Amino acid sequence: MIDYTSFLEQEKEGPLARWVEILPDQISEGLSTKRYGDLEQWLTAMQNLPQVDNVQVSYQSAVTLKSTAPLAQETHTLIEQQFRALIPWRKGPYNIFDIEIDTEWHSDWKWDRVLPHLAPLKHRKILDVGCGNGYHCWRMYGEGASQVIGIDPSPRFVVQFYMLKHFIGSNAPVDLLPVPMEAVPANLQAFDTTFSMGVLYHRRSPMDHLRELKATLRPGGQLVLETLVIEGKLGEVLVPEGRYAMMNNVWFLPSVPTLISWLTKCGFKNARCVDVNQTSTDEQRSTEWMTFQSLSDFLDPNDPTLTAEGHPAPLRAVILAEAPE
């Protein structure tokens, strides 16, 4: 089992104290082998990982782990087998002792689009909502964040994260909690920066999600919001009646002006769009480490500007805004 004891002990006196009181039960529910039938075998894969001394870590495009001494072939093979047991790997890339994990998403490309626009992350306490396996959490730490907490309710992603942290070391102030956004106490106001990337369109009530995000931020803290949008004017929103790009849990795709107005309505200040990008089949695709269908399968085979259902193909915007002082 993943041990959160030191994290809970460290946070019980700080701004997360209210959350720490209820977190043990939330963690137990999020990592329940009764709820998630495959979780036990994923945890076994993590427990099978060997110890590697003197690991060097680079938090660049591919989060890279290297050993100062060559690994024995059987050790290298064992590590690769355990990481493959957690397929599919969606966010990355990673390079684990020369094992290249070519993930479904080139998440480094998104980071390169987002990073230049952010308030500097150095010394910041950061929350990453819906963080997947935590790739961007490591990139945030690499930019000098004092602490990064990711939350994601998928236990596979949580185990993937802690497989990396097994080698990086428990002293790194980066953690991933197996909880959804709803688990975060109201009006926590504990974080300098909160990221929500690839989450808003999965929410039945986008306004509620935006208000929840604002409540995580200290006064003046920065929100980094990345979500699917459509081209259009103020007030225009796509609400797919069926699936969108083969996903049945997509609810609201606003135009950029509409999204900015939502943020303003929810009390954010200075909401502005800093990037709009058409998702390409080079950025999101099937790989050896994610062998299922991907973006090319979700688009109209005769017109890649449309989804298989005839909606506009995925267009992603990055919006920044601040909580009021």
Curated annotation (Swiss-Prot):
* Entry EC no(s): 2.5.1.-
User: What are the protein's UniProt keywords?
Assistant: Transferase, tRNA processing
Q: Single GO molecular-function term?
A: transferase activity, transferring alkyl or aryl (other than methyl) groups
Q: Which domain of life is it from?
A: Bacteria
Reactions accelerated catalytically: carboxy-S-adenosyl-L-methionine + 5-hydroxyuridine(34) in tRNA = 5-carboxymethoxyuridine(34) in tRNA + S-adenosyl-L-homocysteine + H(+)
Pfam families (alphabetical):
Methyltransf_9
Task: Provide the residue positions that the database annotates as binding carboxy-S-adenosyl-L-methionine.
Answer: 91, 105, 110, 130, 152-154, 181-182, 197, 201, 316
| Quaternary assembly | Homotetramer.
What function is annotated for this protein? Catalyzes carboxymethyl transfer from carboxy-S-adenosyl-L-methionine (Cx-SAM) to 5-hydroxyuridine (ho5U) to form 5-carboxymethoxyuridine (cmo5U) at position 34 in tRNAs.
PANTHER family given in the database record: METHYLTRANSFERASE (PTHR43464), TRNA U34 CARBOXYMETHYLTRANSFERASE (PTHR43464:SF95)
Which family does the record claim for this protein?
Answer: Belongs to the class I-like SAM-binding methyltransferase superfamily. CmoB family.
> What's the protein name?
tRNA U34 carboxymethyltransferase
The encoding gene: cmoB
